[in-house]
Amino acid sequence: MNLISTVILIASALSLILILVSFWLPQLSPDYEKLSPYECGFDPLGSARLPFSLRFFLIAILFLLFDLEIALLLPLPWGDQLSNPTLTFMWATSVLALLTLGLIYEWLQGGLEWAE
């Protein structure tokens, strides 16, 4: 067998084993909590239009900004192969500095505090 067939065989066997274990394990000790659906703490029968905390929205926006930062800076190690790597690293440093200053400003303004 070649390498691709071996990898496919191992992946299929591992998937089958995990599927069988996932069906077998819950039957060992069933109780009420394991049999009930996961509800995330929200009332499923109440109104869906509940007020949403602005703190959660702010944390989500900060997470998206820093996630975008990681996505932009991830290919940075290959930046030394460009014609002008110094300029690339200067731009990356300026992006990091700008986001760090924004985070410090948000922290000093109290936007990251949960209790008021």
UniProtKB/Swiss-Prot annotation:
Q: How does it sit in the membrane?
A: Multi-pass membrane protein
User: What broad class of enzyme is this?
Assistant: translocase
Per the UniProt entry, the Enzyme Commission number(s) are 7.1.1.2
Would the keyword Iron be found if you checked this record's keyword annotation? Answer: no
Highest rank taxon of the organism: Eukaryota
- The residues that cross the membrane are 3-23, 56-76, 87-107
State the similarity comment: Belongs to the complex I subunit 3 family.
Name-wise, this protein is: NADH-ubiquinone oxidoreductase chain 3
Organism this protein belongs to: Gadus morhua
